[in-house]
């Protein structure tokens, strides 16, 4: 299980919004030294009918981000992680549908950390998403295609930790995701 605690501050800036904060990633019941902190900065605004967001998150060197391979060299190793991303969304006129897109880049530990997990399992990779949201009152139905540029060979190196099912299929390949979100 992952529990994310987020604290930050938002303020208007040049017609947009600046959001500065910290995410603390916690893994209750996980191996020692799995929790880590990641400061972030996000700038959001609009360009015509399009909502835009750009962000950077940098987790400084921490043991939770190190390469844990059961070798003397990896014992107590600390690594950093950098994540850059951009999001765009726009409502489709005359409909309750919003089109959305995301692109991200991660640079960090080229291996698995505690609990066999990693925020950048291949050292660096790109991720992207294209999707649609359909609003029905307080409920939003979503469908999105998500993918990475992690190759099959890189994903195989990370098995079985990066498996989506018991048959060993990779979580790094493209998938269609469906979501239901309720706002109160």
Language model features with spans:
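Transmembrane beta-strands of outer-membrane beta-barrel pores
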Residues: 11-13, 24-28, 45-49, 56-62, ...
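An amphipathic alpha-helical core segment
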Residues: 118-119, 128-131
